[in-house]
């Protein structure tokens, strides 16, 4: 699985001399260029931000296709997820506010042709804080396929997060 996001912190772009304003266009083009490198026997790509021919990207990924997941809470991110990805990832959401993102994804699906090979768009969310069994059920009812729990950055954080997830799932 490969997670892709265009970024949202302008200072990070300044730090590496990249254009914040063009981040979406660059991301879209790089997705096309990467797929050419991964899947084409003789990869060639000519775009505004990536331009190559006579190269080969090896080793190639064993899993074909690579499951792409696009992150973001904007109309361009929703469009990118529908057009390119197997899944969409939302960060720090509640069961209540995930609905706005799902509405945005449906609107993008009405405007963008989704390749049939991608199948149904899988929805993954990192919830805001601990989740009760009732909240997990509400996420599922809203259309979320997967919850990704964020462990606190403490020595016991991962174990506590796993224990909480087990308790949540056991309560469903």
Can you say where each PLM-predicted feature lies in the sequence?
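Active-site-adjacent structural elements that line small-molecule/cofactor binding pockets in enzymes
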Residues: 1-172
């Amino acid at each position: 699985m490969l997670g892709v996001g265009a970024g949202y912190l302008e200072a990070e772009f300044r730090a590496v001399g990249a254009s914040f304003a063009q981040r979406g266009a660059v991301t879209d083009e790089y997705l096309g260029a990467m797929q050419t490198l991964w899947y084409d026997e003789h990869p060639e790509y000519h775009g505004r931000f990536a331009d190559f021919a006579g190269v080969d990207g090896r080793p190639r990924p064993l899993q074909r296709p690579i499951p792409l997941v696009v992150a973001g809470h904007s109309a361009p991110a929703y469009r990118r997820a529908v057009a390119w990805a197997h899944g969409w990832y939302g960060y720090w959401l509640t069961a209540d506010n995930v609905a706005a993102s799902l509405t945005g994804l449906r609107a993008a699906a009405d405007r963008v042709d989704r390749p049939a090979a991608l199948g149904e768009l899988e929805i993954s969310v990192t919830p805001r804080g601990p989740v009760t069994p009732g909240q997990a059920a509400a996420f599922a009812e809203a259309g979320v396929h997967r919850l990704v729990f964020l462990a606190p950055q403490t020595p016991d954080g991962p174990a506590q997060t796993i224990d909480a997830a087990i308790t949540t799932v056991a309560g469903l």
